[in-house]
Amino acid sequence: TTATNVFCGIISATSVDDYNNNIIKKHEGTLKKRELLFENYLKNTGFNAEPVLLTYPDNDIITSIKNKYKQKIAEYEFCTTDKNSHLLWVVDDENDIRKIVETFKEIDTLYIADGHHRSTSSCLLANNLAKENPEHTGKEDYNFFMSYLLPESQLSIYEFNRFIKDLNGYSP
């Protein structure tokens, strides 16, 4: 929750297979230098510090499961330094987890809204570790990256312009 918006998504482990098989759509190029930097970071820390923001078409099944949990007290609640509040519910009911997984299997396309370098570097690392692992099964932790799945109706995209630093008194 921000001063002007409320978002309700799912934080999950997303398979690099979905990235490699183009279920997750990319719309930006990435810089090889940054890909390698992030891959090295992941290899050294073993930790995704920030989720990749993925968006999907609104879905009534997913929404109803999220709404069920929102009726309960959140497991975690915190406020960031920029005054954004966060409530986190743990989905631990096996039936709900199964429904979420099955529903996302039916969604043909996810789009990267933020995190092209993070997702690419996660895939690079997974592919490299798979080659090094003679017992690779596809279920290892390195085959997944942290993502925040948000329905497209809740997504707000703001212009980002690297070249304009000052509007000289004009409003956007």
List PLM regions with ranges.
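Surface-exposed, charge/polar-rich loops and edge strands
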Residues: 1-172
